[in-house]
C-alpha cells in the first residue's frame, strides 16, 4: 500500500531545489558518545581499567596493580525505511517542467534522499536515548539500558527539573558519582535534554550570570569549569546522565549497508508512476561499566 502523501503548497516552486522539507533534529548526540562504526551485527566491547601501583625498584619483574577488563555484548538491530510516492502528485505541486517528461531529475532525487537521511537522523536522536527493543523499530537506548533492573548504574533520585532546582540536582548527581570516576583522566560529562539546559540557563541568569542571556551559541557549556554539558535533543524530560563518553557506545555497520539509501523510478519496471525510496541500516547501543554511571530520572 503506498505511503500516504502530504503535500503543502506553501513550499511550491518551479525548481526541485525549492522543495523544503520539515525541519528535522540533527543527530547531535552521536558526537557525544563513543561510536563503533563497524560492528558486524554482534561484538564484544571492552573497557580497560588499569589501577597502577608503585613498587620498590628491584632487578626482577614483579607485576603489581590491577587490570580490570569489562565486557558487554553490543548487538545491532536491522532497520529499514521504505516510502512510495506517485510522481504525478509530486510533480504537479513542485516542478511543472518535469511533469511532461515524468522524469525524476537529480535535484529531486537529492531532495528526496536528503529528507530521508534527515528523517533517519531525527528518529535515531530519540531512539538512541529512550528506545525500547521490545518496541518495533527501536533498540534499547542509553536511558533504557542505564535504568534497567540490575544494570548497576547509580540513581541520584528523580523528579521534575526546573530553574529552581536544576543546579542543586546537578550537584546531587555529581556527588553521588564514584570519586574514581570524577578524578579519572577521562572526565565524565553531564548529558541532558533541551528543556533541562534551558532551565539551567534560566538559573544562571537568575543568579546574575548575564552571559547566559546574551552569549548565544558560544555560551559556556561546562559545569563549574570541570564537566562538559552535552545538550542532547533526544533525551527525555527530567533526566540527567553523568558518564564518561567511553561508557556510552553507539554501534553501526557502515561497511555493510549503513547510510546506503535508494530511489527507484518504477515506470520502466511495472509501468506505474510511482517512485520508491528508502534505506536499510543497522544500529545498536550499549553501556560499558554501568557502576561508573550516575543518573537522575525515573
Q: Whereabouts are the PLM-identified features?
A:
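Alpha-helical scaffold segments that mediate packing/assembly in large oligomeric complexes
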Residues: 94-176, 295-298
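Short coil/turn segments at secondary-structure boundaries
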Residues: 95-96, 128-133, 184-193, 213-217
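Helix N-cap / beta->alpha transition motif
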Residues: 8, 86-93, 191-196, 243-245, ...
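Sequence/fold signature of self-assembling virion shell proteins
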Residues: 2-52, 140-165, 201-298
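Long, hydrophobic/aromatic-enriched structural stretches that serve as scaffold segments
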Residues: 54-111
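Ordered core of a single globular domain
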Residues: 171-207
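Extracellular structured ligand-interaction cores
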Residues: 78, 187, 274
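Hydrophobic side chains in beta-strands
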Residues: 81-85, 92, 192, 231, ...
Amino acid at each position: 500500500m503506498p505511503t500516504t502523501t502530504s503535500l503543502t503548497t506553501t513550499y511550491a516552486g518551479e525548481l526541485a531545489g525549492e522543495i523544503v522539507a520539515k525541519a528535522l533534529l540533527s543527530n547531535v548526540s552521536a558526537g557525544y558518545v563513543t561510536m563503533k562504526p563497524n560492528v558486524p551485527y554482534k561484538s564484544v566491547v571492552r573497557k580497560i581499567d588499569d589501577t597502577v601501583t608503585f613498587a620498590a625498584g628491584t632487578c626482577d619483574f614483579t607485576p603489581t596493580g590491577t587490570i580490570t577488563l569489562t565486557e558487554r555484548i553490543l548487538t545491532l538491530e536491522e532497520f529499514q525505511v521504505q516510502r512510495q510516492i506517485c510522481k504525478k502528485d509530486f510533480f504537479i505541486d513542485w516542478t511543472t517542467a518535469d511533469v511532461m517528461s515524468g522524469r525524476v531529475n537529480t535535484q529531486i532525487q537529492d531532495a528526496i534522499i536528503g529528507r530521508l537521511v534527515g528523517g533517519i537522523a531525527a528518529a535515531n536522536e530519540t531512539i538512541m536515548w529512550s528506545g525500547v527493543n521490545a518496541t518495533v523499530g527501536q533498540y534499547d537506548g542509553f536511558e533504557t539500558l542505564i535504568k534497567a533492573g540490575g544494570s548497576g548504574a547509580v540513581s541520584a533520585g528523580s523528579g521534575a527539573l526546573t530553574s529552581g532546582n536544576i543546579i542543586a540536582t546537578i550537584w546531587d548527581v555529581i556527588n553521588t558519582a564514584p570519586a574514581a570516576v570524577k578524578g579519572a583522566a577521562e572526565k565524565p560529562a553531564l548529558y541532558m535534554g533541551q528543556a533541562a539546559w534551558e532551565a539551567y540557563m534560566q538559573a544562571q541568569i537568575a543568579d546574575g550570570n548575564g552571559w547566559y542571556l546574551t552569549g548565544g551559541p558560544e555560551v559556556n557549556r561546562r559545569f563549574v569549569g570541570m564537566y562538559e554539558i552535552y545538550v542532547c535533543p533526544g533525551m527525555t524530560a527530567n533526566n540527567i546522565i553523568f558518564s564518561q563518553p567511553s561508557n556510552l557506545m553507539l554501534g553501526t555497520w557502515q561497511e555493510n549497508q549503513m547510510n546506503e539509501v535508494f530511489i527507484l523510478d518504477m515506470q520502466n519496471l511495472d509501468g506505474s508512476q510511482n517512485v520508491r525510496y528508502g534505506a536499510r541500516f543497522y544500529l545498536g547501543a550499549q553501556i560499558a561499566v554501568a557502576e561508573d554511571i550516575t543518573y537522575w530520572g525515573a
